């Protein structure tokens, strides 16, 4: 639990002009459709941008206001916070916001109203907390290896924080683990601190889906808004090379996310999809109140037994939602109109303003 208290945030909200709310975010990650969705719902928008990185938000015309900073981490500076509060801002957090601002700063220093549950962000950042929440929900996860010396089969090695897969690798022995750790350190992709916190789990063979949910605290309902799969470099390039050439090229696979494409899942798997979302939401309410408020994502593999195995979660808007900026097959069925995740967030904020329930959705 951070130093920023909900009651202090609600004191700030109490002074806001509710008829002139601004939806704000950091200029990265999913900012385009967060801001576009806000404009679709009738809000003013603001983006906090590094100088020189404002081009997409200018060219696509999604931001009414620009707050320029030297570095993205400066969003927690007092002058930036003052500007945000002065424009009645509600900030929508995303992966880059947490990574650049720093989780402790978001918890302890960022005194601006945020959509969702700021306390839950640590539960996605720390692997043990993430695993606790998912397993206590009764959701299948890959087996965890407590130390690299225990590796006796194919495993995936991951590192903490929102890093888009950078530094992740597959290995099948302790010796191979050591060799690949050294290689990743030489590429400056990981540090000694990362190695200490390495998360080692069984490699599950299957098809990849990232399932994007929205939990409406106003309706107490879990929605499935869309799904995507990832383009990862350089693994997606390597698999295009014939096997013999792969061996001769001696390339080391990496799993850095470079893009996303929309997918739909086999319809008979949707009961599992909804059940996993419902279970996680109920567990989150118990572990970190008020729970999984707003968008969240479960990254999974579907094995040949048609079992959904969850290997990672995002407790805020996930980058894969960029794959359905104009709505997905699922959001269209749900709403009958174009509904991106960004617009869904602003729809919830608008409904909360109209029903005087901003305290239910902000922290």
Curated annotation (Swiss-Prot):
Cofactor field: Mg(2+); Mn(2+)
Metabolic or biological pathway, per its Swiss-Prot or TrEMBL entry: Purine metabolism; IMP biosynthesis via de novo pathway; 5-formamido-1-(5-phospho-D-ribosyl)imidazole-4-carboxamide from 5-amino-1-(5-phospho-D-ribosyl)imidazole-4-carboxamide (formate route): step 1/1
Enzyme class: ligase
Keyword Transport: no
Record keyword Transcription present: no
Residues reported in the UniProt entry to bind ATP: 148-210, 232
EC number: 6.3.4.23
Biological-process GO terms, alphabetical: 'de novo' IMP biosynthetic process
UniProt-recorded Gene Ontology molecular function terms: ATP binding; ligase activity, forming carbon-nitrogen bonds; magnesium ion binding
Keywords associated with the record: ATP-binding, Ligase, Magnesium, Manganese, Metal-binding, Nucleotide-binding, Purine biosynthesis
Residues annotated as domain ATP-grasp: 118-354
Catalytic activity: 5-amino-1-(5-phospho-beta-D-ribosyl)imidazole-4-carboxamide + formate + ATP = 5-formamido-1-(5-phospho-D-ribosyl)imidazole-4-carboxamide + ADP + phosphate
Binding note for cofactor: Binds 1 Mg(2+) or Mn(2+) ion per subunit.
Pfam families, alphabetized: DUF1246 (PF06849), DUF1297 (PF06973)
Residues engaged in binding Mg(2+): 299, 312
Binding annotation for 5-amino-1-(5-phospho-beta-D-ribosyl)imidazole-4-carboxamide: 29, 96, 260
Purpose: Catalyzes the ATP- and formate-dependent formylation of 5-aminoimidazole-4-carboxamide-1-beta-d-ribofuranosyl 5'-monophosphate (AICAR) to 5-formaminoimidazole-4-carboxamide-1-beta-d-ribofuranosyl 5'-monophosphate (FAICAR) in the absence of folates.
Family under the similarity heading: Belongs to the phosphohexose mutase family.
PANTHER family documented for this protein: 5-FORMAMINOIMIDAZOLE-4-CARBOXAMIDE-1-(BETA)-D-RIBOFURANOSYL 5'-MONOPHOSPHATE SYNTHETASE, 5-FORMAMINOIMIDAZOLE-4-CARBOXAMIDE-1-(BETA)-D-RIBOFURANOSYL 5'-MONOPHOSPHATE SYNTHETASE-RELATED
Name this protein carries in UniProt: 5-formaminoimidazole-4-carboxamide-1-(beta)-D-ribofuranosyl 5'-monophosphate synthetase
Species, as recorded: Methanosphaera stadtmanae (strain ATCC 43021 / DSM 3091 / JCM 11832 / MCB-3)
